[in-house]
Amino acid sequence: MATKLWTLHFMRICLANLLLFISLYLLYPVLPVVMASRLGVPVSQTGGIYILFTLAMFVIGPFHAYLVDVYKRKYICMLSFGIMVAATAGYTLVQSATHLLLLCLVQGISFGMAATAGITLAIDVTNSTFRSAGNVVFSWAARLGM
């Protein structure tokens, strides 16, 4: 283990976390507009997309603990980031409100997995003497992404 906080691995994980949150929060103001204009969903019902996303993000939590114990953390993180990228790109192909809601469900699950796997990896690559500072820096990367 390195004896400093800012190792290359830690900086990469923080950058990935920053970009993850940026990609998600750039979609938030756009999705209701797309649902209303392109898919014909009433504006009053567009908030359901956020409820579904949030539920999916929280439901995956207990399963994440199992997956991280069984499989390598790095692969769980990479897979969830890959699914998140595919889901974000998939919004361009959506043709119905049902497909959009399913895509939000997939994106919520992958975001929940990516966020928690990222935290786990950040803790793994941080020296125990810098763990508190590492957690603060990692969480600030998420805050800046918002």
State what each model feature region is.
Residues 6-39, 45-46:
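Helix-loop boundary and gating motifs at the non-cytosolic
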Residues 40, 72, 93-98:
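Helix-breaking motifs and short loop linkers at transmembrane-helix boundaries and internal kinks
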Residues 54-62, 146:
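Residue-level signature of mid-helix packing/kink "hotspots" within the transmembrane helices
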Residues 60-72:
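Helix-to-loop junctions at the C-terminal end of transmembrane segments
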Residues 75-89:
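Structural signature of the two symmetry-related core transmembrane helices
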Residues 87, 98-106:
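Paired small-residue
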Residues 113-126:
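Intracellular juxtamembrane helix-capping segments at the cytosolic ends
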Residues 136-146:
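Glycine-rich segments within core transmembrane alpha-helices of 12-TM secondary carriers
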